[in-house]
Amino acid sequence: MKQIFILFLLWFGLSLSAQDQISLLFVGDLMQHQAQIDAARQGDGYNYNDCFRHVKKEISEADMAIGNLEVTLGGKPYRGYPAFSAPDEYLHAIKEAGFDVLLTANNHCLDKGKLGLERTILMLDSLKIHHAGTYRNPEERHKSYPLLIEKNGFRIVLLNYTYGTNGLKTDAPNVVNYINREQIKKDILDARRKLPDVIIACMHWGVEYCSFPERSECELANWLIEQGVDHVIGSHPHVLQPMEIVKDPRTPARHVIAVSYTHLRAHETVL
């Protein structure tokens, strides 16, 4: 039987033989506030060599590492909150740390408008980093979404959606994956046609700095499982919220629902 481990910078799962198993590591929001950008400034460029030094081992040891890229790579001027545009060197550091997949559907993906969305995709493609959530046009989305990755004999599908984009509207022909049940249901059907071993929905939702999820998130998570999603991973609140493992009443399967798993790189203090 194939076994999938889901990790949150801590090992999660059962001790099994190395055969027919894969480890997936999910981390929270990868951000760049102004203090971080200023601290990385070095001469005419930016140096992020030490950015992930304390967690690089865990990231690189996972078979697949997935993070939420909650900045744009919109070019200069580089800015932190409220409209993020991170230096390209930050993405290089993320790649060097061992990340394989970055999620881009979040409330900051339109911070630098059409240019920022498209340049972010261009940079991700240039470094051959898999990504899901935003697209230059509908044709690009149709071609590459749902995101299917084959690794260690596994077929893994990743879905990614956001609750909103801070009131900013998407400029045609760009596409942002917003949370829309009708569209998500179609995407899940498309995902199932790819005959994956697992479908994981990565949702950008919830209330910032709230220790517990809203009822609407719990209902949506359960709906996703009912539609055929195997696991649900959440982001946006910037704090760790309860995680549960749900037994499937119809099969021996167990579903991980992690509503929020906080951020990995940011410059914020929660009291």
Where are these regions (language model features)?
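Sec-dependent N-terminal signal peptides
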Residues: 4-13
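Acidic, metal/ion-coordinating pockets
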Residues: 19-265, 271
